[in-house]
Regions:
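General helical structural elements
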Residues: 7, 73-74, 191
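Intrinsically disordered, low-complexity cationic segments
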Residues: 8-11, 119
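Short, Lys/Arg-enriched N-terminal segments with co-localized hydrophobic residues
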Residues: 1-9
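Catalytic core of non-heme Fe(II) oxygenases with the double-stranded beta-helix
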Residues: 92-200
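Non-heme Fe(II)/2-oxoglutarate
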Residues: 12-97
């Protein structure tokens, strides 16, 4: 995959970010199951640090979403940058998946303690979802730890790596059932959802 750059100068919480990039040079995709990949080392350090600062930037606002205990970044400068990053990822994803894609939406989620999500399948309109955990605060190896998305279309189910700068890429043509088990801690993630481009 090629590295795509998005040159933006931003100031947030007295931290200057000269450049926010898309996929970092060390990104790795590991096939976990049919049409599902674990993603490792997704973004470079500057981009990751910027993403980790979103929830402490006092210029940002969050909305309460359903299910409860999940906050969604509302519109603003950081949200607009996130949308642009989602668009800049398209060429690499198209090359990997051999599909023509259109960004539907980019999201930043802050999951609070005891957030969980019941088994569900994504809308058939969503063809590709890329979710990356940018920060996780919990006690590892504890029964009440935070969990990554758990995909239930294989037996036993498999869990996306709940590690900073890692996550999953889901080709949703088979509408996999997945869930999030609740735990104690907080979890920040960015999610990019794509549908098929109209010229497909």
């Amino acid at each position: 995959l090629t590295r795509l750059g998005l040159n933006i100068h931003m100031t947030h919480n007295n931290i200057n970010t000269e450049e926010v990039n898309c996929f970092g040079q060390d990104v790795k995709f590991e096939l976990a199951a049919p049409n599902l990949w674990w993603v490792h080392n997704t973004f470079d350090d500057d981009t990751l640090k910027w993403m980790q600062s979103i929830y402490v930037n006092l210029d940002n606002k969050f909305e309460v979403t359903r299910p409860e205990r999940r906050l969604l970044l509302a519109d603003g400068a950081d949200n607009r940058t996130l949308q642009e990053i989602g668009r800049m990822l398209v060429p690499s994803l198209e090359k990997m998946l051999d599909l023509k894609l259109n960004l539907m939406i980019s999201k930043f989620w802050l999951d609070l303690p005891y957030f969980g999500c019941q088994p569900h399948g994504d809308s058939s309109e969503i063809i590709v979802t890329l979710q990356i955990y940018v920060d996780v605060k919990h006690i590892e190896d504890h029964q009440l730890r935070m969990y990554g998305a758990e995909f239930m279309h294989v037996d036993p189910l498999i869990e996306a790596p709940i590690i900073e700068n890692c996550g999953y890429l889901n080709l949703n043509t088979d509408q996999k059932i997945h869930q999030v088990t609740w735990g104690c801690g907080t979890r920040q993630s960015v999610t990019f959802q794509y549908n098929l481009a109209t010229d497909n």
